[in-house]
Amino acid sequence: MKGRSLNAEDRARLEAAIGYQFAEKERLDRALTHSSARSGRAINYQRLEFLGDRILGLCVAELLFQTFSDANEGELSVRLNQLVSAESCAKVADELSLHEFIRTGSDVKKITGKHMMNVRADVVESLIAAIYLDGGLEAARRFVLEHWTHRAASADGARRDAKTELQEWAHARFGVAPKYRTEDRSGPDHDPRFTVTVEVDGIDPETGVDRSKRGAEQVAAMKLLEREGVWQKRSAGN
């Protein structure tokens, strides 16, 4: 969807998909508006995304705390990072077909595809914030539980911290320590994207992207461990 707002039919279809009816329809429009859709009032989802990220983290942390009563802080953190990642949020967006409703400028060709994963993830967080502002925390929590409870149950929390695992594996296999290098930092200050490369002498490097430097390091380490067969690669449904 390009610059136009939702019509009544589209709004009803989307509200049915997400299981929530907005009292203030403008909140839903804002949550779906990418910064490239330059309207006269320059309304977009960036501020909502900032809030939605925190609400999602709270609701998922609460879910994990209640579900995995025997898990320690480290395991809970691993599970949390998996569940609130851009990849997980983008999968929720795809399940809801949000790409059909996102408002963009004419210079944005398409929202689908891996290279636009962050946009779809951002819209999910913005949608959570819009629901929170319109209906309160309980409404936002219901949405999160609907789409994250089964993910929490299937998340591979048994995995250790990826950087720790890679450190020990690289030392045992090659007698060296991994080296991490920050390749790029992009995005606005409130929502940065870090690109980090991890190198282990003797094998090809891997690159990770995340909203924090540490997160990007973890993603890069995880990808290398999966590529080398140290960790089993997670299925697309998890």
Curated annotation (Swiss-Prot):
Hydrolase recorded as keyword: yes
Binding site for Mg(2+): E49, D122, E125
EC id: 3.1.26.3
EC class name: hydrolase
Protein's UniProt name: Ribonuclease 3
Residue intervals of the RNase III domain: 11-136
Lineage: superkingdom: Bacteria
Originating gene: rnc
GO biological process, one term: tRNA processing
Compositionally biased region (Basic and acidic residues): 180-193
Role noted for this protein: Digests double-stranded RNA. Involved in the processing of primary rRNA transcript to yield the immediate precursors to the large and small rRNAs (23S and 16S). Processes some mRNAs, and tRNAs when they are encoded in the rRNA operon. Processes pre-crRNA and tracrRNA of type II CRISPR loci if present in the organism.
Subunit comment: Homodimer.
Pfam family, one: Ribonucleas_3_3
Residues at the catalytic site: D53, E125
Every DRBM domain range: 161-230
